[in-house]
A protein has these predicted regions:
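P-loop NTP-binding core
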Residues: 1-296
Length: 296
């Protein structure tokens, strides 16, 4: 199986990027129908808030964390160092994470100068792909990327490294509008990366509804999103359920949460887990379809 890289991206804060990425990472490994695939999953966190790290390996999101994904890029460490010093296991075996830290924000801010100093001759948008992902292509089957809601060097590196983008579309009016504005600006953003000398290998951008309820205005948003994305819109959604919010409070995903210690209705947890698994299977099937057909 050839490594496939997905980037869940939206410039709207609170748009379910991290919840989606964490749920996909765990569900790709633990979904009953995907167990036999024995998929090796790596999540890479570039959000200085380290929310993805909290979900997947919360002990690595506390205090001073020096071995972050941003540092791995900048230090251009070897594959062996990546595996031994930077990659940490999540609570589900077979799913690993490279953490983020609040200090990474300063690296993103001065990225161009840092690259000129530490990585002379390297394209500033190709660092993630060349210094991390290319070294791990035989160690993982899927890599999920998560960045903060900022148009910074890390987001551009994620776009420059991804095979596929996934855009969560929350239906709240302001969130939905800003999400569609981001989608409209993507071609120009990709052009700017390529004009700087790095070729993007994006096959496409798949949209999906997040935080959705069974309400008429949410259904209208879903219809409008289908008009924008066409066949690139997933029918499967990531609904707004109590289980997702409660699990976030205990640094779990709905996949990894223990029903015995879950602070809430076990039925609610079961519903959220089922929704996350259904969503992950739909994403997996779409990726396999794209691979088989050589594009969208």
């Amino acid at each position: 199986r050839v490594l496939f890289r997905s980037f869940v991206c939206n410039l709207k804060g609170g748009g379910s990027k991290t919840v989606s990425t964490a749920s996909l990472s765990h569900a790709f490994r633990a979904h009953p129908q995907l167990l036999f695939e024995d998929l090796r999953i790596l999540a890479i966190d570039f959000d200085p808030q380290a929310s993805l790290t909290m979900f997947l390996s919360h002990e690595n999101s506390v205090g001073l964390v020096e071995n972050t994904a941003a540092q791995a890029m900048l230090q251009n460490v070897s594959r062996e160092e990546l595996l031994s010093d930077f990659i940490v296991p999540s609570i589900i075996p077979g799913v690993d994470v490279i953490p983020a830290s609040i200090d990474d924000a300063f690296l993103a801010e001065g990225w161009k100068g840092l690259c000129e100093e530490h990585l002379p001759g390297k394209n500033i948008h190709a660092v993630l792909k060349e210094n991390i992902i290319d070294k791990l292509q035989h160690d993982y089957d899927f890599i999920f990327l998560d960045s903060g809601p900022h148009l910074d060097a890390f987001l551009k590196n994620c776009i420059g490294a991804a095979d596929l983008m996934l855009t969560p579309l929350p239906p709240a009016t302001v969130d939905f509008h800003s999400s569609l504005k981001f989608v409209a600006s993507l071609p120009a953003l990709i052009d700017s990366i390529e004009m700087d000398g790095h070729t993007c290998n994006l096959i496409g951008n798949v949209g999906f509804m997040s935080k959705i309820l069974n309400k008429s205005d949410h259904k209208i948003c879903h219809s409008q999103a289908k008009e924008v994305f066409g066949a690139d819109m997933l029918d499967m959604v990531l609904p707004r359920l109590d289980g997702f919010e409660r699990c976030g409070e205990t640094f779990d995903t709905v996949i990894s949460a223990n029903p015995a210690t879950y602070d809430g209705s076990t039925e609610a947890l079961k519903s959220a887990k089922s929704a996350a698994e259904d969503f992950a299977k739909a994403v997996f099937d779409r990726i396999e379809f794209i691979r088989t057909n050589g594009g969208m």
